[in-house]
């Protein structure tokens, strides 16, 4: 059979890694796919810059539309990232009858419903394993490996930058701002780190995982996101003292009322495997009704880990190119006519336990006032730490773990506590999950 001709959009870190993997493992990949896969064309904004890959024999252009409109290209690999241009290129490729492989989580999370609808009309595939958790084949695991299960919940460390920052804060007692600056210097975080530290990047990925797990439309706008910027060294230290680790988790849970979709810092018991995933590594815990909890761990970013997922998608495309579109694995795991309209629950309906840290005057009656407010909202205390204030200080930090309560009750209780004259500043809140 004749080779499958591929056009790559973007020759940055992932694009270069993809070319290297395809070249180095060409024979093995062809044996798996049943046909040779050849990159014939590639686009890059700057054609003169040095690269991590060999582009000899590849037709290069600075105009990506030359590739998506080229009549001889069978598959387009989109690795430029971003929203508008990527969407335009992918939809053009689809309109021209080309299959698409992408690592673009923002594209899928925000525009995936439209992209998949157009792909179905044209009978082409759009695969996106590399969009979530880099080299971890988590999408294939949920979409195919766990197809016999009703997925009950999933929770994941799906942003390596945030995990690196929290790990450094814990292991070296460093402040958030200090570690963030280092992460930027090392290339783990962008110059504008908002997407990483405010939970937006993880929210994109959670949107995709939840859609595949529960058979719902992609709905990024309904994901609750809270970043790690307010986490302090004190929080990390007290969490450790209480037997927990702070991890920035993306959590999706199906309940009788609907589906929870949330990204936020979370206390996890130290004994959990996912609590011990450190540095820039990723991990996703998926619980199915038949299989129980399953954990997937690996590199969430990097040239070749992400390229591993891109190339795996290419192999899947080549294997299925000649099959009837009706017999292919659905884009979002469930058949298009079986996507369910299940409500996404508002954040204030979440029920969980909490870690609270507040600063109060060191005098009698203050703690009683705080516990009275919590009790008035039906909130019970599970554990409490109150240390002597430093010499010369009149305020003391109070740390509490609560039992499970509704988010809306906790919101009201925190507002009442912050209104006390004896309490200064904001009450720090971190949600707690046992993940059992």
Regions found by a protein language model. Give the residues of each.
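Rossmann-fold NAD(P)-binding glycine/threonine-rich loop
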Residues: 85-96, 105-143
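Substrate-binding/catalytic subdomain of NAD(P)-dependent oxidoreductase enzymes
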Residues: 178-276, 281-283, 302
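Rossmann-like NAD(P)H-binding beta-loop-alpha module
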Residues: 120-201, 208
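Low-complexity, glycine/alanine/valine/leucine- and proline-rich hydrophobic stretches
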Residues: 264-289, 303-304, 375-393
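Short, ordered loop/turn segments at secondary-structure junctions
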Residues: 45-47, 105-107, 113, 131-133, ...
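A conserved regulatory-domain signal marking ACT and ACT-like small-molecule sensing domains
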Residues: 309, 314, 318-436
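N-terminal glycine-/serine-/threonine-rich beta1-alpha1-beta2 phosphate-ribose binding loop
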Residues: 1-96
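A short hydrophobic/small-residue beta-strand
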Residues: 99-101, 381
């Amino acid at each position: 059979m004749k080779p499958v001709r591929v056009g790559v959009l973007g020759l940055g870190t992932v694009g270069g890694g993809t070319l290297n993997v395809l070249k180095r493992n060409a024979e093995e990949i062809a044996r798996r796919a049943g046909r040779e896969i050849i990159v014939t064309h590639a686009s890059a904004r700057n054609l003169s810059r040095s690269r991590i890959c060999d582009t000899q024999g590849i037709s290069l252009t600075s105009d990506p539309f030359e590739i998506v409109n080229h009549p001889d290209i069978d598959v387009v690999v989109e690795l430029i990232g971003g929203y508008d241009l990527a969407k335009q290129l992918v939809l053009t490729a689809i309109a021209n009858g080309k299959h698409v492989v992408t690592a673009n989580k923002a594209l899928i999370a925000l525009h995936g419903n439209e992209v998949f609808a157009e792909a179905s009309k044209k009978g082409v595939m759009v695969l996106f394993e590399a969009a979530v958790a880099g080299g971890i084949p988590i999408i294939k695991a949920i979409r195919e490996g766990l197809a016999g299960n009703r997925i009950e919940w999933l929770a994941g460390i799906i942003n390596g930058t945030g995990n690196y920052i929290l790990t450094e804060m814990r292991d070296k007692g460093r402040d958030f701002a200090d570690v963030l600056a280092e992460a930027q210097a090392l290339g783990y975080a962008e110059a504008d780190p908002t997407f990483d530290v405010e939970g937006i990047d993880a929210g994109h990925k959670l949107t995709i995982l939840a859609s595949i797990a529960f058979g719902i439309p992609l709905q990024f706008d309904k994901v609750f996101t809270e970043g790690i910027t307010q986490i302090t060294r004190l929080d990390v230290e007290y969490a450790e003292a209480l037997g927990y680790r702070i991890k920035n988790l993306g959590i999706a849970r199906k309940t009788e009322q609907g589906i929870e979709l949330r990204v936020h810092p979370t206390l996890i018991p130290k004994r959990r495997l996912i609590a011990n995933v450190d540095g820039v590594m990723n991990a996703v815990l998926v619980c199915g009704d038949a299989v129980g909890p399953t954990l997937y761990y690996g590199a969430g970013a990097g040239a070749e880990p992400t390229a591993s997922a891109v190339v795996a998608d290419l192999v899947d495309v080549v294997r299925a190119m000649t099959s009837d579109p009706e017999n292919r694995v659905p884009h979002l795991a469930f058949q298009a006519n079986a996507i369910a309209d299940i409500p996404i629950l508002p954040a204030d309906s979440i029920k969980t336990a909490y870690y609270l840290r507040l600063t109060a005057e060191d005098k009698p009656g203050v703690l009683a006032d705080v516990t009275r407010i919590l009790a008035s909202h039906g909130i019970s205390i599970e554990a409490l730490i109150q240390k002597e204030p430093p010499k010369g200080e009149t305020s003391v930090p109070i740390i509490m773990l609560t039992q499970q309560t509704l988010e809306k009750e906790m919101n009201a209780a925190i507002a009442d506590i912050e209104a006390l004259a004896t309490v200064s500043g904001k009450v720090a809140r971190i949600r707690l999950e046992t993940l059992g």
